[in-house]
Amino acid sequence: MLDIGRPVKKPLLDDMMALARMKLVFNHNIENTSSHKELSHTAVLDVLITIEYNPRSELAREHQEEMVASHMRTAFSIPHHRSMYMDSGYPSEPFLAEAASRQMHRYGSPYMVWILRDYIRHGLADLGQKGDMVMRFFLRIAYIEAIVAEQGSTDPNFSKGCNFLTFLKALFAEGFHASVLGCQPDNNVAPPSALADMFKHAVVRFTHFARGASGCTMTTRGMVMAFLRGAAIIGQKDEKTLDIAIPILLDEKHKIEETSMSAFLIQVKRRHHASVVNAYPIDANKLGFFPKGSPADARPYVTLVAELGVKEPPSGMDHLVISQRCKRGSAHNVSQLQSKIPRNVDATERPRYGLRAFTCSDRVWKVVDPRQVEMYEQMLGVDTLLTAHPRQTEESLQLVRQMLPYWYHQPAWFSDEVTTGSPVSSNEFYEDPELNQGEGSGAEDDMQVGSPKLEESTVFEPEAKV
């Protein structure tokens, strides 16, 4: 508001913004980024994506305490025993989030990837939440790029918001733009309309992420408050269906009220194997996202299931799958960009545009630098003990197996020609447990990725590492 007010107010706003940036990075020279400490970059990143810290890491606690002292982090509470830790964080503060957005634009996203990677690699971040953090990083970079695309790179105002279609084009690789913008509702809403037509006047506005305290935040009423504060909502850690909700104002000319709101609903998975195409459906009606008892209206919404942990999409599918509605009693052709999810016709259903993305590579995400794909895979733990081994010959892999890093269905010595007297195919017995991670769903997928199952022929089989 100050930006469009009296001329004397604009210099005051600029001075306040510069002060916020200086206090956030704890440095008077906000433009000379080479003089900034690594913790300055961490503070900026924390404001924007909400880093989940490892509660067992002493170094992580020290970093949080230093950010409370010098980088605008808020100490919420000190437990009554006054030992070990304090409860702290960056609350939803729009002005500070705008300052952090401008500072991150100054730093550049490639360098910030290193900060996030180091926190995950050194155990400072909560490993169970690293998939969600990477996804939030993708969304923040896409939002920054969309703002720059609409406003230019000189002094952009990130709190202004941007067109939802511009945001989608900044998020997904160019090869999928036509498919995403032209996709149809996957729940047989009549008459169907393309996503680009339904959201051509829609606006997204989120300069930071805020964790929802209860399910009431994941509603259209909650989206009103989130949009006003410029925040996207993070689901609770035990939420199994929804991880992130980005508020959408469907028409920039309408009032910001409940009847004008929708959302981009996202679920993040870090499984090493891609799930079936109809797994993890996101149904806004079942989630209670829209008001109960209200008549169905034409408000559309978009869903995304991001399977970041897989290295390749399922056979016959591309890296981005568009859910395709099916007509009853008639055959239809399904391309590699269309899923085979059967849908029931419901005249009261709101239009749902379903997307499913596989891998963390630049082939699906425009915000990913091709030179940093391997870094993202390392962050997400895509490589396993055997797949990351430098020598991928069967002889070398068998030598690794013989060191018994895991107990398999049959131990290594049992299939060895020396003990059996005849060669036995190792493929008959060996199965890398790390390649079968992620049989659960929701938060459990991240905290404990696919605990191996005990079988009758198995003596002992420890948990696969995350």
Q: Where are the predicted features?
A:
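Charge-enriched interaction surfaces
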Residues: M1-V466
